[in-house]
């Protein structure tokens, strides 16, 4: 790849081991991809005994194993961790990575996982309330504190949080519904979108930014492809973004995306990505 294109890769974290994940991250970094991203799950939706990599420890190891790529969550589940703890984890990863973290965060969507782990999973509107307050808590703690705020969800009292991340990581709101997109426009530094809903929702995102009095130029829209593609399905080598990346990138940018993410679940997928980068 002659120069880094804004194309990153979500590396599957289900049914793989951490050595594969880190080796893949190193290969993609060397090939010139812009970032490596992780899902945030604890349990497989398929075979329950499949290994599932924890997102934040995996990304921290990846930051140590790479030199240039962004590391990010696509996306963290707000219900999985108290936002004060998440703020501290993200701040440390931002420092460890030399400022390469992007925090994507959303309301989650795997209720069986929550039931298995005893983690609350209220209805979507209530999870959205958790998300909005969590973003407020995270940003407040990233100032270093002290932070005191009464709350029925996440109260804080004289909370300090050092070291302060500098710069603070951008926070992308994962959303695939109209309500989620409106929330992303109102509180996010950008929107983490998926290809199956993006074209339908992107006009609403622009309208919601206008309604919130926010400029589109200050936002980052990251669009993920293939998140629902089954492991071992159609080969990634046939993905249009790999065949004609600049043309496809221009097309999706015209539609409103800034960065594009492909999903790789297997060594064959990573091989296809590396081979494609050598041709560009």
Go through each PLM region and give its residues.
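Active-site-adjacent structural elements that line small-molecule/cofactor binding pockets in enzymes
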Residues: 1-280
């Amino acid at each position: 790849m002659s120069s880094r294109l804004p194309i990153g890769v979500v590396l599957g974290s289900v049914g793989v081991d951490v050595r594969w994940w880190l080796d893949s991250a190193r290969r993609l970094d060397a090939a010139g991809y812009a970032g490596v991203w992780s899902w945030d799950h604890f349990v497989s939706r398929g075979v329950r005994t499949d290994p599932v990599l924890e997102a934040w420890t995996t990304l921290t190891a990846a930051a140590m194993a790479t030199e240039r790529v962004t590391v990010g969550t696509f996306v963290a589940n707000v219900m999985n961790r108290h936002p004060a703890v998440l703020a501290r984890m993200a701040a440390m990863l931002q420092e460890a990575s030399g400022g390469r973290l992007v925090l994507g965060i959303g309301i989650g969507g795997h209720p069986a996982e929550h039931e298995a782990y005893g983690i609350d999973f209220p209805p979507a509107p209530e999870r959205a309330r958790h998300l909005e307050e969590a973003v407020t808590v995270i940003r407040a703690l990233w100032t270093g504190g002290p932070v005191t705020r009464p709350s029925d969800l996440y109260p804080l009292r004289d909370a300090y949080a050092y070291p302060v991340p500098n710069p603070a990581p951008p926070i992308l709101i994962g959303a695939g519904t109209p309500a989620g997109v409106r929330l992303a426009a109102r509180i996010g530094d950008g929107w983490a979108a998926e290809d199956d809903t993006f074209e339908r929702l992107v006009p609403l995102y622009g309208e919601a930014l206008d309604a919130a009095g926010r400029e589109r130029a200050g936002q980052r829209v990251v669009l993920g492809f293939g998140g629902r593609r089954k492991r071992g399905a159609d080969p990634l080598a046939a993905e249009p973004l790999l065949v004609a990346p600049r043309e496809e990138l221009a097309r999706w940018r015209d539609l409103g995306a800034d960065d594009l993410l492909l999903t790789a679940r297997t060594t064959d997928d990573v091989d296809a990505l590396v081979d494609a980068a050598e041709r560009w």
